Structures are given as structure tokens and as C-alpha cells.
């Protein structure tokens, strides 16, 4: 026997390897392809919606932080002039610990931040 046709005691048959190609219904194959493309587009749409929402929420967070920074800058400028802002006095005296910073944030928004953050 020829060494190329014998491996491990088994005789190889000449011919094609693997599964025999079945007669594939071309219409069914085309429909599966279309369905797969539809699903792919739907997944892509969901992914982009998620990313847009994520960007939007991050932009809102950035605006809120800019507003807070502006508020603190105003407080620092007032203290540099020797004035103590009423909000800081309220915080130091313990009056409305939760209400004072929120009120100041709204005032800071009305000054310069409307132009920067939509």
C-alpha cells in the first residue's frame, strides 16, 4: 500500500472531504440573509440610541458641574471682597442644609450658564 493513503491503520478514500453540499433552497437562504440583516440593523439602532442617551446624560452632568463651579467662583469672589454670601452663612449656622445649595444653584444658572449649557 501507498504511505500517503494509510494513516493509523485506516485507508483514506480519494474524493471530497466534509459534508456533501445539500441542495440549498436559494429563496430560503435569501430570506435568512434578509432576516439577519434586519436583526443587525435593529441591534445597531438600539446601540446608537443607548450611546446617544449616555452622551446626553453626561452632557447634563457636565452642565450641572459647571453651574456648581460657577456658584463656588461667585462665593470666592464675594469672600475676596470681604463679603460672606448668605448661603455660606446658612450652611455654617446649620439652617436648611439641603435647601441652601439648591437655591444657589438655580441663581447661578440664571447668570452666565444659560449660554453655555442648553
Curated annotation (Swiss-Prot):
The residues that cross the membrane are none
The record's annotation in Pfam families points to:
bZIP_2
Q: Which domain of life is it from?
A: Eukaryota
Give the CDD domains listed for this entry. bZIP_CREBL2
The protein's location, in the record's own words, is: Nucleus
Record GO terms (molecular function): DNA binding; DNA-binding transcription factor activity
Where does it sit, as one GO cellular component term? nucleus
> Per the record, which residues fall in region Disordered?
1-25
Keywords of the record, alphabetical order, are:
Activator, Differentiation, DNA-binding, Nucleus, Transcription, Transcription regulation
**Compositionally biased spans, kind Basic residues:** 10-21
- Alphabetical list of InterPro entries matching this protein: bZIP, bZIP_sf, CREBL2/REPTOR-BP
Which residue ranges does the record annotate as region Leucine-zipper?
62-69
* Keyword Chaperone among record annotations: no
Q: Where is this region: Basic motif?
A: 29-60
> Domain bZIP, which positions?
23-86
Which biological process, per GO, is one annotated for this protein? positive regulation of lipid biosynthetic process
Q: Which family does it belong to?
A: Belongs to the bZIP family. ATF subfamily.
Function text: Probable regulator of creb1 transcriptional activity which is involved in adipose cells differentiation. May also play a regulatory role in the cell cycle.
Protein name, per record = cAMP-responsive element-binding protein-like 2
Record organism: Xenopus tropicalis
The gene it comes from is: crebl2
